[in-house]
Amino acid sequence: MSAVEPHSISLRARLAAALLLGVVTASAGGATRAAEDNPRVRLVTSLGNIDVELFEQQAPKTVANFLRRVDENFYDGLIFHRVIAGFVIQTGGYDQGMNYREPPGNVVNESSNGLENRKGTLAMARLSDPDSANTQFYINVADNAHLNATGGQPGYTVFGRVVDGMDVVTEIELADTTRKAGMVGVPEQPIVVQDVERL
């Protein structure tokens, strides 16, 4: 009967662990590099800054559309017009006078990209038509699995995540709201997107 000596087991275990660590480190390094390559933007709001990483590989059309609007200063001066605690904070459509800013065009739905509506992610708002998203987006303030694509049915396209400024997101979420211009969840004191800039 052959036996494996204890020091041999130890050596093999160390080698296996080293190889595994190398694989994990390489994978983590790849993810870090990919994250560093992702475009980032800063939402300068009247309550503070929110820095966002955009998932260009998973949602290329959505990110391209969003960055185009950023470069056109489309979002400057708009408000968070829909604030629902425990759900979402939404912007991209109305100014302080509740005047609707007409979007330039729609973007195709990319909700089957594997990204989920989790707390801290950004996703596109839309109507019942899956391809009706344009400029309005929201930040999830909770995990909202019911907004994900499921069973072949399209959901709401996730295209980014907050990397800094979740305290500002929470402050917006907890703002006192009212009904205004036929909409619920409008902050009593306007919370303005003063600028959106690339980082």
List each model region and its residues.
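Hydrophobic helical h-region of N-terminal Sec-dependent signal peptides
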Residues: 15-21
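Cyclophilin-like peptidyl-prolyl cis-trans isomerases
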Residues: 2-5, 10, 22-199
